[in-house]
Design a protein with these regions (language model features):
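Short alpha-helical elements
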Residues: 1-145
Length: 145
């Protein structure tokens, strides 16, 4: 690996090449669904919360969303993987979008069948029934209500 970078450099370089990697992933990088899939979402902050009023680069694309580190403007990455860890599909939305967004799942259901394992953010009876009618069984954690 003559041109390999360290992990620290990789973390610094990743935001610079993230949007260049998306078209590559759409063309080359997706795996095949084998009947068992996993889905989750995570926040991609575009700037620190204190600088949100001055950030104009992603002004039209980003919304304020709450992640594990608190509120910040950013995007939400919805990621669908198969059981061996291959990315099946991904979708970027504003950070305040719900995990059960119908537009995201319209994209996901094109490559999906079988069982999908998700966290508690995907619990909703109507959403479960909609996927079940398409032949997709949603498996999620129990809600503590």
């Amino acid at each position: 690996f003559l041109y390999a970078v360290s992990y620290t450099c990789f973390v610094e370089l990743m935001p610079c090449v993230f949007f260049d990697l998306m078209p590559f992933m759409r063309i080359q990088g997706f795996g095949k669904c084998m009947g068992i899939s996993f889905v989750d979402s995570t926040m991609i902050p575009v700037c620190h919360n204190m600088r949100r009023k001055f950030n104009k680069v992603f002004d039209e694309l980003t919304k304020n969303g709450k992640g594990t580190m608190g509120w910040c403007p950013g995007l939400k990455l919805h990621l669908l993987c198969n059981e061996i860890g291959d990315v099946l599909m991904f979708c970027l939305t504003p950070a305040n979008e719900d995990d059960r967004n119908p537009r995201v799942w319209k994209v996901f259901t094109k490559v999906l069948y079988g069982k999908v394992f998700a966290d508690k953010g995907y619990i909703k009876q109507e959403f479960f029934e909609n996927l079940f009618n398409q032949g997709i069984h949603l498996v999620h954690g129990l809600s503590r209500t």
